[in-house]
Amino acid sequence: MKEWQKDRIDIIKKILPKLGENYVLKGGTALLLYYGLDRFSEDVDLDSISGNMNILNKLKTIGQNKWNMSIKKDTETVFRVMVDYGATNNYGDYPLKIEISSRNKKFLQSKIYDYKNIAGVNVYSLDEIL
């Protein structure tokens, strides 16, 4: 794994436990960090349990107001933000994309979708991800 990939994983591990109980991690990052998939995933995909998707204030606190953030999408069902924490790779600037969806809110609230809390991070079960 390249150094910039290790740095990306470290920043994701720093962010996830501080977002709180309202979010459930899904996708490639969940598979990489919590299920041992040997494949690099470079963004964070979350589902919101309550429907509150705007995490800018939490990110400002985590980044100690040093990160630049750019909202790319803000609708009733999706919130997407790019977090520039100073990372670069072979191609230049390398911001972190965080996307939150509220489309599965009712399924999460009614416990139809299975997830568990691992070290302070809600993560979908492997069956739900696959």
Which stretches of residues belong to each language-model region?
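Compositionally biased terminal segments of proteins
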Residues: 1-26, 30-130
